[in-house]
């Protein structure tokens, strides 16, 4: 008996795989739907077309799910932001109120202090004026005019000379 070579069965199986008695004009599932019967269609082709369409649908579903998750995340961020907007405004208003109140009190104290200083200065000048007036009425020379013995120039002489 003749022993077949080991490469011959492989060659026969390769030829059998290459030779397809089925129709290959089918490119999509829509082409399959147009056929009356699936008897002449290669089951591997049907499986491949179904897998391709399933992959397309899965990728579309994943994209839709990602968009939905992204929109939900944006809504959650906006809601989280809304939770902090009102307290932030309240904090800003309260802090500005307290700052302005403190600043007003500080200005008021500074004003009062300056007013007391000026009042003391006015009192000192008033006393000096009163003493000068009293000295003038009593006939004495005022204490202010230490070098006042010289007569001042008349104003019209300054224009002429």
Curated annotation (Swiss-Prot):
Disulfide bonds: none annotated. Residues 1-22 form a transit peptide. The keyword Transmembrane applies. It comes from the Eukaryota. Its main location: mitochondrion. Keywords: Chaperone, Coiled coil, Membrane, Mitochondrion, Mitochondrion inner membrane, Transit peptide, Transmembrane, Transmembrane helix. It is found in: Mitochondrion inner membrane. Residues 23-84 are mitochondrial matrix. It is a single-pass membrane protein. The chain crosses the membrane at residues 85-107. Belongs to the INA17 family. Component of the inner membrane assembly (INA) complex, composed of INA17 and INA22. Interacts with a subset of F(1)F(0)-ATP synthase subunits of the F(1)-domain and the peripheral stalk. Component of the INA complex (INAC) that promotes the biogenesis of mitochondrial F(1)F(0)-ATP synthase. INAC facilitates the assembly of the peripheral stalk and promotes the assembly of the catalytic F(1)-domain with the membrane-embedded F(0)-domain. This is Inner membrane assembly complex subunit 17. It comes from Lachancea thermotolerans (strain ATCC 56472 / CBS 6340 / NRRL Y-8284) (Yeast).
């Amino acid at each position: 008996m003749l022993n077949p070579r080991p490469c011959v069965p492989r060659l026969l199986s390769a030829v059998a795989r290459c030779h397809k008695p089925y129709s290959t004009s089918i490119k999509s599932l829509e082409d399959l739907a147009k056929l009356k019967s699936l008897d002449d269609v290669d089951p591997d082709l049907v499986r491949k077309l179904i897998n391709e369409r399933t992959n397309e649908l899965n990728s579309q579903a994943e994209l839709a799910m990602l968009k939905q998750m992204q929109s939900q995340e944006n809504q959650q961020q906006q809601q989280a932001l809304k939770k902090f907007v009102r307290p932030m405004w309240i904090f800003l208003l309260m802090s500005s109120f307290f700052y302005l109140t403190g600043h007003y009190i500080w200005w008021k104290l500074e004003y009062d202090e300056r007013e007391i200083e000026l009042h003391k200065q006015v009192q000192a000048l008033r006393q000096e004026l009163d003493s000068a007036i009293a000295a003038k009425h009593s006939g004495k020379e005022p204490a202010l005019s230490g070098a006042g013995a010289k007569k001042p120039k008349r104003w019209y002489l300054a224009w002429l000379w």
